Amino acid sequence: MIGMGIETSCDETSIGIVRDGKDLLSLKIFSQIDLHKPYGGIVPEIASRAHLEKINLLLEEAMEESEIQFKDLSYVAVTSSPGLTGSLMVGAQMARCIHMVYETPILPVCHLQSHFAVLHLEGVPTEFPVLGLLLSGGNSAIYILHEFGKMELLGDTMDDALGEAFDKVAGLLELPYPGGPHIEVRAKEYKPSPNEKPILPALLRNLPQEEVSFSFSGLKTAVMVLLEKQKELSKERICWNFQNSAFDLVERNLKRAVSKTGIKRIFAAGGVLANFTLQNRLYTWAEKNSVELFAPKKKIYCTDNGAMVASLGYYLFQKGYQRDIDFTVSPSRQEIFS
C-alpha cells in the first residue's frame, strides 16, 4: 500500500511517499529558516506564502523520485491540526486537488501524533500502550499513546515550549536563529569542573511528586538576569548550564510518567530531539532504569516532514479512517484527543 503525506503546519513544506507505513520511497522538504531568520522567529504570512510557492515543485519531485503515478496512491494524508491556519490550508488544498482529480481517499491527521509515527520508518515495532515525549518549538508534553489516533495528555508545558526557550535564550546570547543547534555546539565546548555548582536554577522542584509538567519561561528569565549581573560569563558556560537545567526537567518528568503509569516504553520525538546531547542523556537514563526508549536516529525525522504524515496515515487508513473533502483545519491542539 502506497500513501502520500503532506506537511505544511509551520515552516517546512514537505511531501513524503511511503509504502506500508515504513518503507520510504521519497521525502522532499523545503525549510523556510532563511526566510524567517531576519525576524528572529516565524512570520505566519511569510510561511503560508512560501508553502504556496514550493508545494507544487516538491510534489513533482517526490512523484518522480518514487517512480509512481497518482493512481498508485491508496490514500493522501495531510496535516490538518495543530499549526498555523494559513499554512495548514495550503496543504489541505493540495490534498483536496489530488482527491478531486484521482478520487484518492483523504486522511486529515494530527501533526503531533505523526511525530511519533515517524519512528516506524526506522524499524521501531508498534506496541501499545507507550509513553510519547514530544519536544519541539511549539510543544513540550508527555502523552500516553493507546493506539495511533488515540492519545491521552499526561503532562504539558505551563508556558514556553523547550524549542521556543532555545530560540529565546539564543537571542539573549546573540546567537543565530534557530537557536537550538548553536546552543548545543556552544555547550559542547564547555567543560565543567567536577565540583562546579549550577549557575541556573533547577526547574519546578516544588511540584507534587505525581505531577508531570514543563515550564521554561523562568529559565529564560534566569539567563537574562545572569547576563545583566555577570557579564564576564562565557556563552559556552551559559549554554551548558541552560541545557543541563532544561534536560534535568525532561528527565525528571519522564521518571514521574513511568512511575505514574507503569509504562516502560517511550517514543521521543520532535525537533528538539535533533539535539543529540539530549538523546544521549535520555538513552543513558533509560538504560539505567530498564526503560525502552526510541528516538529518531536521523535528524531529518526529528523535524516536520511528510513521511511521518504518510506513516501515520497508513495506520489510520488500515482502521477505516478517512474524511470528506470539506474537512477543516485548526490551529488548536485540543482536537487531537479522543
UniProtKB/Swiss-Prot annotation:
- Give the record's cofactor note, including how many are bound: Binds 1 Fe(2+) ion per subunit.
Instruction: Give binding positions for Fe cation.
Output: 111, 115, 304
Which superkingdom does the taxonomy of this entry point to? Bacteria
Name any cofactors this protein relies on.
Fe(2+)
| Chief location of this protein within or outside the cell | cytoplasm
Localized where?
Answer: Cytoplasm
Q: Give the reaction(s) catalysed.
A: L-threonylcarbamoyladenylate + adenosine(37) in tRNA = N(6)-L-threonylcarbamoyladenosine(37) in tRNA + AMP + H(+)
Q: Which Gene3D superfamilies match?
A: 3.30.420.40
Could you say which residues bind substrate here? Answer: 134-138, 167, 180, 275
Q: Which InterPro entries match?
A: ATPase_NBD, Gcp-like_dom, KAE1/TsaD, TsaD
Which protein, by its recorded name, is this?
A: tRNA N6-adenosine threonylcarbamoyltransferase
